[in-house]
Amino acid sequence: HASMPIGAYSEKQIMPQEKLVIVPDGISNEIASCIVLKGITAEYLLHRSYSAKKGDKVLFHAAAGGVGQILCQWANAIGCTVIGTVGSKEKEAIAKKNGCHHVINYTDTNFVEEVEKIVGKNGIDVVYDGVGAKTFEGSIECLKVRGMMVAFGNASGYVHTLDIKKHINAKGLFFTRPSIAH
């Protein structure tokens, strides 16, 4: 998968060796290109946007998606308590199988109330939100004092405004909107 510098849609590209990954036999280029982007995304979310550590309480929206499946397994392996949200009954088993200790279907359940039942009133250390508009306000409610909101996607729509007094001052929260290009 070649994305930087210019040439992502080229049939061939000259790349620096340190930017390349050897693909094992038996894995097609199509599969490898999908895995690499999702894996890179999971890595920068879990280690560069917020450095998750053993004992952290993590909330990941869209836990059954490509990035979610990788990140939830990884966070579980680190020793985090992993809470994942999904948008359908079918995806609950996928999220559970891929490292979520707790799975919440946010289409038929108030995920804010469920998170509080799981972790108590102190809240979540970090929320990884790739959903966007539908989950943004609730995600903020779930965070602990000085918690971190990592907003990396907008599958349900963009969050157009951020009320600093309401969203940040109330709990002293941290926000980031990371990009793998940086």
How should these model regions be labeled?
Residues I78, V86, K134-H182:
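Glycine-rich phosphate-binding loop and adjacent beta-alpha segment
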Residues A62-A63, V131, N154:
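NAD(P)H cofactor-binding loop motif with strongest signal on the N-terminal glycine-rich segment
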Residues N76-G138:
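Adenosine-nucleotide cofactor-binding segment
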Residues T41, G66-V67, K134:
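Hydrophobic/small residue at the entry helix of a nucleotide-binding pocket
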Residues A64, G68, C72:
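N-terminal Rossmann NAD(P)H-binding glycine-rich loop of SDR-like oxidoreductase domains
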Residues H1-A62, W74:
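NAD(P)H dinucleotide-binding glycine-rich loop of Rossmann-like/cofactor-binding domains
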Residues H1, L59, I104, D125-Y128, ...:
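N-terminal Rossmann-like NAD(P) cofactor-binding module of classical short-chain dehydrogenase/reductase
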